[in-house]
């Protein structure tokens, strides 16, 4: 299973590194090109994915099912972080392509009850916050794509963990953009700026799950 995880990590790293970021930004669609792999900043993708994979192996050395579930969840959030930063968009087909094998391994490892409860909790909790923010403030506290990502985390963990990850992500994002506002000082521009939340969700996920 660890060998499969290594192969999967390698191909996801190639996929992320081959994404045409300019095309993604302009068209909000994913286009891959072998030429992009050569760009120097893709070394960051390799370093992050490689070391997280190694840490997951050490963390779940005696449970390869939990290893592959957590690896799939991490890789999905990582891809979504890239698309969220570049075009402020989360692609549902990417979420589903990782959710299906996560469900399979949850059934295989007999974690399905915990994962389903975590999934439902993530959808209900953040769905209610999303709806209430639209009703009372006329704006979204976060996007539907963020709910997809948090629901995937719920499917991979449990209700308590997904709640803490979401809360920590909001706090970190709030601090980051407060500091940014201090330097920008343009309130109108800042108020209408879309905030990519998934990178903060990824950061919170790595901190709260693995450290």
Each predicted region: which residue ranges?
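A membrane-topology feature that recognizes alpha-helical transmembrane segments
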Residues: 1-211
